[in-house]
Protein backbone atom coordinates (compact mmCIF):
# COMPACT_ATOMS: atom_id res chain seq x y z
CA UNK A 1 0.00 0.00 0.00
CA UNK A 2 2.81 2.33 0.83
CA UNK A 3 4.52 1.52 -2.40
CA UNK A 4 1.40 2.47 -4.37
CA UNK A 5 1.12 5.85 -2.61
CA UNK A 6 4.75 6.60 -3.27
CA UNK A 7 4.39 5.82 -6.95
CA UNK A 8 1.28 7.99 -7.14
CA UNK A 9 3.12 10.96 -5.63
CA UNK A 10 5.99 10.49 -8.04
CA UNK A 11 3.64 10.55 -11.03
CA UNK A 12 1.77 13.71 -9.86
CA UNK A 13 4.14 15.97 -7.89
CA UNK A 14 2.75 18.89 -5.84
CA UNK A 15 3.23 22.43 -7.13
CA UNK A 16 3.60 25.44 -4.76
CA UNK A 17 1.62 28.42 -6.06
CA UNK A 18 3.32 31.74 -5.21
CA UNK A 19 1.30 34.71 -3.90
CA UNK A 20 -0.60 36.93 -6.29
CA UNK A 21 1.79 39.86 -5.88
CA UNK A 22 4.74 37.74 -6.98
CA UNK A 23 2.82 36.48 -9.99
CA UNK A 24 1.99 40.01 -11.11
CA UNK A 25 5.55 41.15 -10.56
CA UNK A 26 6.97 38.24 -12.51
CA UNK A 27 4.64 38.96 -15.43
CA UNK A 28 5.33 42.68 -15.46
CA UNK A 29 9.08 42.55 -15.01
CA UNK A 30 11.23 39.76 -16.47
CA UNK A 31 13.76 38.15 -14.22
CA UNK A 32 17.40 39.18 -14.31
CA UNK A 33 19.92 37.14 -16.24
CA UNK A 34 22.02 36.66 -13.14
CA UNK A 35 19.22 35.01 -11.17
CA UNK A 36 16.59 33.71 -13.59
CA UNK A 37 14.83 31.52 -11.02
CA UNK A 38 14.57 34.12 -8.21
CA UNK A 39 12.05 36.85 -9.11
CA UNK A 40 12.61 40.36 -7.74
CA UNK A 41 10.56 41.44 -4.76
CA UNK A 42 8.21 44.36 -5.34
CA UNK A 43 5.68 46.15 -3.17
CA UNK A 44 2.63 48.23 -3.81
CA UNK A 45 2.68 51.84 -2.64
CA UNK A 46 -0.23 54.24 -2.18
CA UNK A 47 -0.35 55.23 -5.86
CA UNK A 48 -0.80 51.55 -6.95
CA UNK A 49 2.52 51.45 -8.75
CA UNK A 50 4.95 48.59 -8.46
CA UNK A 51 8.29 49.69 -7.05
CA UNK A 52 11.35 47.74 -6.11
CA UNK A 53 12.90 47.63 -2.66
CA UNK A 54 15.73 49.91 -3.79
CA UNK A 55 13.33 52.54 -5.06
CA UNK A 56 11.26 52.27 -1.90
CA UNK A 57 14.35 52.84 0.25
CA UNK A 58 15.17 55.95 -1.76
CA UNK A 59 11.63 57.24 -1.26
CA UNK A 60 11.87 56.62 2.47
CA UNK A 61 15.14 58.53 2.66
CA UNK A 62 13.70 61.42 0.67
CA UNK A 63 10.63 61.46 2.88
CA UNK A 64 12.79 61.44 6.00
CA UNK A 65 14.94 64.29 4.70
CA UNK A 66 11.79 66.16 3.80
CA UNK A 67 10.35 65.75 7.27
CA UNK A 68 13.55 66.85 8.98
CA UNK A 69 14.27 69.72 6.61
CA UNK A 70 13.97 73.14 8.27
CA UNK A 71 12.34 74.68 5.18
CA UNK A 72 9.88 71.92 4.38
CA UNK A 73 6.73 74.04 4.68
CA UNK A 74 7.04 75.09 1.04
CA UNK A 75 6.34 71.53 -0.19
CA UNK A 76 4.63 69.74 2.67
CA UNK A 77 1.00 70.84 3.22
CA UNK A 78 1.11 69.41 6.75
CA UNK A 79 3.90 71.86 7.66
CA UNK A 80 2.11 75.06 6.67
CA UNK A 81 1.34 77.70 9.27
CA UNK A 82 -2.42 77.33 8.93
CA UNK A 83 -2.34 73.56 9.36
CA UNK A 84 0.02 73.72 12.32
CA UNK A 85 -2.05 76.32 14.15
CA UNK A 86 -5.60 75.13 13.40
CA UNK A 87 -5.40 71.45 12.34
CA UNK A 88 -2.32 69.83 13.88
CA UNK A 89 -3.36 67.38 16.63
CA UNK A 90 -6.90 68.79 16.44
CA UNK A 91 -8.50 66.93 13.53
CA UNK A 92 -9.18 63.30 14.37
CA UNK A 93 -7.19 60.64 12.57
CA UNK A 94 -9.18 58.44 10.17
CA UNK A 95 -6.61 55.67 9.69
CA UNK A 96 -7.93 52.29 10.79
CA UNK A 97 -4.70 50.35 11.15
CA UNK A 98 -2.24 50.88 13.98
CA UNK A 99 0.58 53.35 13.39
CA UNK A 100 3.00 55.57 15.26
CA UNK A 101 1.13 58.52 16.79
CA UNK A 102 4.24 60.66 17.01
CA UNK A 103 4.62 60.63 13.22
CA UNK A 104 0.94 61.32 12.59
CA UNK A 105 -0.16 64.97 12.48
CA UNK A 106 -3.73 64.15 13.54
CA UNK A 107 -5.25 63.60 16.97
CA UNK A 108 -5.93 60.19 18.53
CA UNK A 109 -8.12 59.19 21.51
CA UNK A 110 -6.21 59.46 24.77
CA UNK A 111 -3.20 61.18 23.22
CA UNK A 112 -1.43 63.72 25.43
CA UNK A 113 -0.57 65.92 22.46
CA UNK A 114 -4.25 66.51 21.67
CA UNK A 115 -5.13 70.18 21.35
CA UNK A 116 -8.23 72.33 21.55
CA UNK A 117 -9.24 74.25 18.48
CA UNK A 118 -8.36 77.92 19.13
CA UNK A 119 -11.21 78.93 16.83
CA UNK A 120 -13.79 77.22 19.05
CA UNK A 121 -12.26 77.57 22.52
CA UNK A 122 -11.11 80.96 23.74
CA UNK A 123 -7.81 80.36 25.53
CA UNK A 124 -4.54 82.26 25.60
CA UNK A 125 -1.01 81.12 24.87
CA UNK A 126 0.00 81.10 28.55
CA UNK A 127 0.43 77.76 30.33
CA UNK A 128 -2.20 76.90 32.93
CA UNK A 129 -0.62 76.93 36.44
CA UNK A 130 -2.84 74.08 37.66
CA UNK A 131 -2.02 71.96 34.61
CA UNK A 132 1.69 72.65 35.09
CA UNK A 133 1.65 71.49 38.71
CA UNK A 134 -0.47 68.36 38.48
CA UNK A 135 -0.78 67.60 34.78
CA UNK A 136 -4.54 68.08 34.88
CA UNK A 137 -6.96 71.00 35.14
CA UNK A 138 -10.30 70.96 36.95
CA UNK A 139 -11.87 73.35 34.43
CA UNK A 140 -11.12 71.11 31.48
CA UNK A 141 -11.75 72.56 28.03
CA UNK A 142 -13.30 75.70 29.55
CA UNK A 143 -9.95 76.82 30.95
CA UNK A 144 -8.68 80.13 29.61
CA UNK A 145 -5.05 78.98 29.61
CA UNK A 146 -3.13 76.51 27.46
CA UNK A 147 -2.81 72.86 28.50
CA UNK A 148 0.50 71.38 27.45
CA UNK A 149 3.34 72.38 25.21
CA UNK A 150 1.46 71.96 21.93
CA UNK A 151 -1.42 74.23 22.95
CA UNK A 152 1.02 76.80 24.25
CA UNK A 153 3.46 77.06 21.34
CA UNK A 154 1.07 76.21 18.50
CA UNK A 155 -1.28 78.99 19.55
CA UNK A 156 -1.73 81.61 16.78
CA UNK A 157 -0.23 84.36 18.95
CA UNK A 158 2.96 82.38 19.71
CA UNK A 159 3.65 80.01 16.80
CA UNK A 160 6.83 81.00 14.95
CA UNK A 161 6.99 84.41 16.57
CA UNK A 162 10.50 83.67 17.85
CA UNK A 163 13.63 82.43 16.13
CA UNK A 164 14.90 78.89 16.64
CA UNK A 165 18.22 78.68 18.46
CA UNK A 166 19.40 75.88 16.14
CA UNK A 167 18.55 77.80 12.98
CA UNK A 168 19.02 75.85 9.77
CA UNK A 169 20.55 72.93 11.67
CA UNK A 170 17.31 72.11 13.49
CA UNK A 171 16.38 68.41 13.30
CA UNK A 172 13.00 68.47 15.05
CA UNK A 173 10.04 66.98 13.24
CA UNK A 174 7.73 69.71 14.53
CA UNK A 175 9.44 72.93 15.54
CA UNK A 176 7.51 75.81 17.05
CA UNK A 177 10.04 78.46 16.05
CA UNK A 178 11.14 80.18 12.86
CA UNK A 179 14.27 79.10 11.02
CA UNK A 180 14.44 81.92 8.46
CA UNK A 181 13.18 85.50 8.17
CA UNK A 182 10.51 84.27 5.76
CA UNK A 183 9.07 81.93 8.40
CA UNK A 184 9.02 84.55 11.16
CA UNK A 185 5.49 85.73 11.86
CA UNK A 186 4.99 89.38 12.89
CA UNK A 187 1.71 89.89 14.71
CA UNK A 188 -0.34 93.10 14.70
CA UNK A 189 -0.32 95.14 17.93
CA UNK A 190 -3.91 94.24 18.81
CA UNK A 191 -3.10 90.51 18.61
CA UNK A 192 -0.01 90.92 20.76
CA UNK A 193 -1.97 92.67 23.51
CA UNK A 194 -4.66 89.98 23.38
CA UNK A 195 -7.39 92.26 22.04
CA UNK A 196 -9.48 90.96 19.20
CA UNK A 197 -9.26 92.85 15.94
CA UNK A 198 -12.34 95.07 15.67
CA UNK A 199 -12.99 98.04 13.42
CA UNK A 200 -12.25 101.22 15.36
CA UNK A 201 -13.31 104.79 14.57
CA UNK A 202 -9.74 105.52 13.57
CA UNK A 203 -10.01 103.02 10.71
CA UNK A 204 -13.01 104.89 9.31
CA UNK A 205 -11.67 108.45 9.47
CA UNK A 206 -8.48 109.14 7.50
CA UNK A 207 -7.65 112.13 9.68
CA UNK A 208 -7.43 109.97 12.80
CA UNK A 209 -5.25 107.54 10.88
CA UNK A 210 -2.81 110.34 10.09
CA UNK A 211 -2.86 111.54 13.68
CA UNK A 212 -2.33 108.07 15.11
CA UNK A 213 0.54 107.29 12.76
CA UNK A 214 2.72 109.90 14.44
CA UNK A 215 4.22 108.58 17.72
CA UNK A 216 4.68 112.10 19.10
CA UNK A 217 1.29 113.53 18.13
CA UNK A 218 -0.49 115.53 20.83
CA UNK A 219 -3.86 114.66 19.34
CA UNK A 220 -3.74 111.20 20.85
CA UNK A 221 -5.02 112.33 24.26
CA UNK A 222 -6.69 109.67 26.37
CA UNK A 223 -8.16 107.70 23.47
CA UNK A 224 -7.78 104.00 24.05
CA UNK A 225 -7.09 103.10 20.42
CA UNK A 226 -4.67 105.99 19.91
CA UNK A 227 -2.73 105.90 23.18
CA UNK A 228 1.02 106.29 22.96
CA UNK A 229 3.45 103.83 24.40
CA UNK A 230 5.25 104.88 27.62
CA UNK A 231 8.64 104.66 25.92
CA UNK A 232 7.72 107.31 23.35
CA UNK A 233 6.08 109.78 25.72
CA UNK A 234 8.23 112.60 27.17
CA UNK A 235 8.70 112.91 30.95
CA UNK A 236 5.81 114.63 32.66
CA UNK A 237 6.28 117.93 34.49
CA UNK A 238 4.91 118.54 38.02
CA UNK A 239 1.15 118.44 38.34
CA UNK A 240 0.67 122.05 39.48
CA UNK A 241 2.37 123.37 36.34
CA UNK A 242 0.98 121.02 33.69
CA UNK A 243 -2.55 120.40 34.97
CA UNK A 244 -4.08 123.09 32.78
CA UNK A 245 -2.20 121.96 29.71
CA UNK A 246 -3.22 118.35 30.28
CA UNK A 247 -6.84 119.47 30.42
CA UNK A 248 -6.25 121.47 27.25
CA UNK A 249 -4.93 118.38 25.51
CA UNK A 250 -7.88 116.31 26.74
CA UNK A 251 -10.25 118.96 25.38
CA UNK A 252 -8.53 118.83 22.00
CA UNK A 253 -8.59 115.04 22.01
CA UNK A 254 -12.31 115.04 22.80
CA UNK A 255 -12.89 117.37 19.84
CA UNK A 256 -10.97 115.03 17.54
CA UNK A 257 -12.83 111.97 18.84
CA UNK A 258 -16.19 113.71 18.33
CA UNK A 259 -15.22 114.54 14.77
CA UNK A 260 -14.06 110.96 14.20
CA UNK A 261 -17.34 109.57 15.54
CA UNK A 262 -19.25 111.67 13.00
CA UNK A 263 -17.47 109.88 10.17
CA UNK A 264 -18.52 112.40 7.51
CA UNK A 265 -16.04 115.20 8.26
CA UNK A 266 -12.91 115.59 6.21
CA UNK A 267 -9.50 116.76 7.34
CA UNK A 268 -10.29 120.48 6.93
CA UNK A 269 -13.47 120.19 8.99
CA UNK A 270 -11.67 118.35 11.77
CA UNK A 271 -8.90 120.95 11.77
CA UNK A 272 -11.37 123.84 11.95
CA UNK A 273 -13.24 122.11 14.78
CA UNK A 274 -9.98 121.67 16.67
CA UNK A 275 -9.00 125.32 16.21
CA UNK A 276 -12.45 126.47 17.33
CA UNK A 277 -12.23 124.39 20.48
CA UNK A 278 -8.77 125.75 21.28
CA UNK A 279 -9.92 129.31 20.60
CA UNK A 280 -13.01 129.05 22.80
CA UNK A 281 -11.32 127.66 25.87
CA UNK A 282 -9.84 129.97 28.51
CA UNK A 283 -6.24 129.84 29.65
CA UNK A 284 -6.86 131.61 32.95
CA UNK A 285 -6.13 128.42 34.89
CA UNK A 286 -2.85 127.97 33.08
CA UNK A 287 -1.80 131.55 33.78
CA UNK A 288 -2.83 131.22 37.42
CA UNK A 289 -0.85 128.02 37.82
CA UNK A 290 2.21 129.50 36.15
CA UNK A 291 2.13 132.78 38.15
CA UNK A 292 2.68 130.93 41.43
CA UNK A 293 6.43 130.84 40.80
CA UNK A 294 8.69 133.31 38.93
CA UNK A 295 10.40 130.35 37.29
CA UNK A 296 7.27 129.58 35.25
CA UNK A 297 7.19 133.00 33.53
CA UNK A 298 8.16 131.49 30.13
CA UNK A 299 5.22 129.09 30.52
CA UNK A 300 2.79 131.99 30.87
CA UNK A 301 4.36 133.77 27.91
CA UNK A 302 4.03 130.64 25.81
CA UNK A 303 0.40 130.28 26.91
CA UNK A 304 -0.43 133.87 25.91
CA UNK A 305 1.33 133.49 22.58
CA UNK A 306 -0.48 130.20 22.00
CA UNK A 307 -3.88 131.79 22.72
CA UNK A 308 -3.35 134.72 20.37
CA UNK A 309 -1.90 132.48 17.66
CA UNK A 310 -4.92 130.16 17.91
CA UNK A 311 -7.33 133.08 17.46
CA UNK A 312 -5.48 134.53 14.50
CA UNK A 313 -5.00 131.09 12.94
CA UNK A 314 -8.74 130.59 13.14
CA UNK A 315 -9.27 133.89 11.29
CA UNK A 316 -6.78 132.86 8.61
CA UNK A 317 -8.57 129.54 8.20
CA UNK A 318 -11.91 131.28 7.56
CA UNK A 319 -10.28 133.68 5.08
CA UNK A 320 -8.71 130.80 3.20
CA UNK A 321 -12.07 129.05 2.94
CA UNK A 322 -13.75 132.20 1.56
CA UNK A 323 -11.02 133.38 -0.82
CA UNK A 324 -9.55 131.30 -3.67
CA UNK A 325 -6.05 129.94 -3.28
CA UNK A 326 -3.18 132.02 -4.63
CA UNK A 327 0.58 131.46 -4.90
CA UNK A 328 1.19 134.04 -2.14
CA UNK A 329 -0.39 131.72 0.42
CA UNK A 330 2.50 129.31 0.06
CA UNK A 331 5.20 131.99 -0.08
CA UNK A 332 4.96 132.75 3.64
CA UNK A 333 5.01 130.34 6.53
CA UNK A 334 1.59 130.04 8.25
CA UNK A 335 3.28 129.71 11.63
CA UNK A 336 5.22 133.00 11.51
CA UNK A 337 4.83 135.11 14.68
CA UNK A 338 4.49 138.35 12.69
CA UNK A 339 0.72 137.86 12.63
CA UNK A 340 0.61 138.59 16.35
CA UNK A 341 0.67 142.33 15.61
CA UNK A 342 -2.04 144.33 13.89
CA UNK A 343 0.28 145.65 11.19
CA UNK A 344 -0.71 144.80 7.60
CA UNK A 345 1.10 141.98 5.87
CA UNK A 346 3.91 143.10 3.58
CA UNK A 347 3.80 142.11 -0.04
CA UNK A 348 6.26 139.42 -1.02
CA UNK A 349 7.33 141.28 -4.18
CA UNK A 350 7.49 144.82 -2.67
CA UNK A 351 10.57 146.67 -1.44
CA UNK A 352 9.26 146.80 2.11
CA UNK A 353 9.51 143.03 2.46
CA UNK A 354 13.07 142.27 3.52
CA UNK A 355 14.36 139.49 5.76
CA UNK A 356 15.95 142.07 8.07
CA UNK A 357 12.73 143.98 8.58
CA UNK A 358 10.81 140.74 9.03
CA UNK A 359 13.17 139.60 11.77
CA UNK A 360 12.83 142.96 13.53
CA UNK A 361 9.04 142.74 13.40
CA UNK A 362 9.14 139.25 14.88
CA UNK A 363 11.49 140.37 17.65
CA UNK A 364 9.31 143.40 18.45
CA UNK A 365 6.18 141.28 18.59
CA UNK A 366 7.70 138.70 20.93
CA UNK A 367 9.09 141.47 23.17
CA UNK A 368 5.65 143.07 23.45
CA UNK A 369 4.05 139.74 24.33
CA UNK A 370 6.70 139.09 27.01
CA UNK A 371 6.25 142.55 28.58
CA UNK A 372 2.46 142.22 28.65
CA UNK A 373 2.74 138.81 30.25
CA UNK A 374 5.11 140.08 32.93
CA UNK A 375 2.74 142.92 33.79
CA UNK A 376 -0.26 140.55 34.02
CA UNK A 377 1.60 138.08 36.17
CA UNK A 378 2.77 140.83 38.54
CA UNK A 379 6.40 139.76 38.22
CA UNK A 380 9.21 142.25 37.70
CA UNK A 381 11.29 142.09 34.57
CA UNK A 382 14.59 143.08 36.28
CA UNK A 383 15.94 140.83 39.04
CA UNK A 384 16.26 142.19 42.56
CA UNK A 385 19.97 142.59 43.31
CA UNK A 386 19.58 144.42 46.63
CA UNK A 387 20.81 141.46 48.62
CA UNK A 388 24.09 141.58 46.69
CA UNK A 389 24.67 145.18 47.83
CA UNK A 390 23.93 144.17 51.41
CA UNK A 391 26.62 141.50 51.23
CA UNK A 392 29.20 143.89 49.80
CA UNK A 393 28.66 146.63 52.44
UniProtKB/Swiss-Prot annotation:
Zinc finger (C3H1-type): 122-150, 159-181
InterPro entries with a match to the protein in the record: Unkempt-like, Znf_CCCH, Znf_CCCH_sf
Cellular component, GO, one term: nucleus
Record's subcellular location: Nucleus
Expression sites (tissue/organ): Specifically expressed in seeds.
Ranges annotated as biased composition (Low complexity): 20-37
Record-level GO BP terms: negative regulation of seed germination; regulation of DNA-templated transcription
Gene3D superfamilies: 3.30.1370.210
Keywords: DNA-binding, Germination, Metal-binding, Nucleus, Repeat, Repressor, Transcription, Transcription regulation, Zinc, Zinc-finger
Region (Disordered): 1-71
Zinc-finger recorded as keyword: yes
Ranges annotated as biased composition (Basic and acidic residues): 60-69
PROSITE patterns per record: ZF_C3H1
Phenotype of gene-disrupted mutants: Increased levels of JMJ20 and JMJ22 in far-red (FR) conditions.
This protein's record includes keyword Transport: no
GO molecular function: DNA binding; DNA-binding transcription factor activity; zinc ion binding
Pfam families: zf-CCCH, zf-CCCH_AtC3H23
Protein origin, superkingdom: Eukaryota
Subunit structure of this chain's protein: Interacts with MARD1/FLZ9 and RD21A.
Misc. remarks from the entry: Plants lacking SOM germinate in darkness, independently of various light regimens.
Function comment: Probable transcription repressor that functions as a negative regulator of phytochrome-mediated promotion of seed germination. Inhibits seed germination by regulating the expression of gibberellic acid (GA) and abscisic acid (ABA) metabolic genes. Does not regulate the expression of the DELLA genes RGA and RGA1. Activated by PIL5, a phytochrome-interacting basic helix-loop-helix transcription factor. Represses directly JMJ20 and JMJ22 expression in the absence of red light (R) and in far-red (FR) conditions.
Record's protein name: Zinc finger CCCH domain-containing protein 2
Natural source organism: Arabidopsis thaliana (Mouse-ear cress)
Amino acid sequence: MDVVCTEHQMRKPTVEIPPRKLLLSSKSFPSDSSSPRSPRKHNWNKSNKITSEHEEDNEDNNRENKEYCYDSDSDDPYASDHFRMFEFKIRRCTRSRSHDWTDCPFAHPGEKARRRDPRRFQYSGEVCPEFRRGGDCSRGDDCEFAHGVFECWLHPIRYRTEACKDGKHCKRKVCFFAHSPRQLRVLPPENVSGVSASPSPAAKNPCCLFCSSSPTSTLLGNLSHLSRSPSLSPPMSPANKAAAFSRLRNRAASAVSAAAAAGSMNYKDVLSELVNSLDSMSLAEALQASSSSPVTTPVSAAAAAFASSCGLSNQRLHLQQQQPSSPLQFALSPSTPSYLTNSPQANFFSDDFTPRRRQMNDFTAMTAVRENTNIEDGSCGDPDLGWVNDLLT
